[in-house]
Every structure is written in C-alpha cells, then in structure tokens.
Amino acid sequence: MRSLIICILLLFPLSLGAQESDNRIWVNAGLKVGFQAITYNNPTFGIDGYTYNENTIQSNKIGYTLAPFMRVTAKRVYVQFETIFGTSRHSFDFKSTGSNSDLLSNTTEYSLKTLCLQVPIVIGYNMIQEGKYVMSVFTGPKTKFVFTAHDEQEFKHFKYGQMEEVLKKRCYYWDFGLGVKIGNVFFDFTYDLGITKVSEYIISKSENLKFKSDRRDNILSFSVGMIF
C-alpha cells in the first residue's frame, strides 16, 4: 500500500506538467513572402447603356507580397494577425462585337497596377500534427487598403480619350486557406473571395463622362515563410 501511494505521488507532478503543457498558449511571430493573381466574379464595364463582359479575356498577371505576422496558438486552434504589403497587376482584353463596335476597336485593353496593404485576421485549425509536420486549414476576414495615388492605369484604343478608373480605397474579402508546416518553414495556399466592389466608376476626362464599373475581385495567393 505504501509503495502504491509513493508511485502515485511520484506520477502526480508528471501528469500535472503534461496537463499544463496541453493548456499552454503559444505566441509566435514570423515572416512570409509570396505572389498573388487576381480573378473577377463579374468583370463588367458599362458605357452609355452598353455592358460587355462575355467577350472579356482576363490576363492574370502576378503581384508580389511581403507579410510579417503574429500567431497565438492554444492546442490545435490558432489566431493569426498579418500585415501584407504587396502589388496587384492585371489586365482585360475586350473583343469588339456588333453591339459595342462604336465603343471599342479590335485591340481594346485595360491594364492596372496597384500598391496595397492587406490586413487579414484568420482562425486556423491544425488537422494533422505529427512531430514537426503540421497541416492546417484557416479562414477569416480581410481588409485591403489601396493606395490610389500610386496606381498605374492604361486604357488602350477605347474611343473615349483620357479615361481613368476611380478605385475604392478600401475593399473587403473572406479568406479560405490551407497551410503546411515542416519545422519552422511553412507554405500557405489562400483564396480570397471578394465581398465588396473594387471600383467606384470610370471617367472620360476629355468627354466629361462617367461610366459604371461593377466587379469584385478574387485573389489566389501562394506564400512561403518561417515562424519562430
């Protein structure tokens, strides 16, 4: 009996330490770099009552990102705060048809490059956690701030001269992602679903006209980084 009591007393601190370890909250920081491509749910332009998107060809160009982050983890669940600095690049080629031939030529193109700051807050869950190998899924809201004073736009061969798109300075998204971590190195694959429109309107300065632009962008991104 005495031996049993001694064994229980010896094992009690070990079990208590394990319990404290399971309930411990970990705070980590890291840095990641990556690239992103933009697609659109509805790349529709409207000019003088004409709308055209069915003949639109999207040329998805690559933008680049740099992001410091902080992660707070409890057991298998974590919350991650990021600040993503990056560029977005994309273009549209519009095909002229009978209904819009008075607006477009055969080689009409619109290209755009922007500088932006993205602030996501995601909640993740480590589905697989074996030693140094971890696979997780995550989701959460993202706000994108566009530095409109530094954007680069080009409208080619539109029949209205000196056109410019007035972009929204703040847009909202919802993130869905998959992460793989090996030791301190990780890879993230993310899809951002656009919730709000990215454009206010398009103006023709020479003709003093304002055109509607109705589109929400989605963002596909890949990043690699280290967490400490």
Locations of the language-model features?
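Extracellular/periplasm-exposed beta-strand and loop segments of Gram-negative cell-envelope proteins
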Residues: 38-61, 88-116, 142-175, 195-221
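Short glycine/proline- and aromatic-enriched beta-strand/turn motifs that initiate or cap beta-hairpins
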Residues: 19-67, 227
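Bacterial Sec-dependent N-terminal signal peptides
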Residues: 1-28, 32, 220-228
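Outer-membrane beta-barrel "beta-signal"
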Residues: 183-186, 214-228
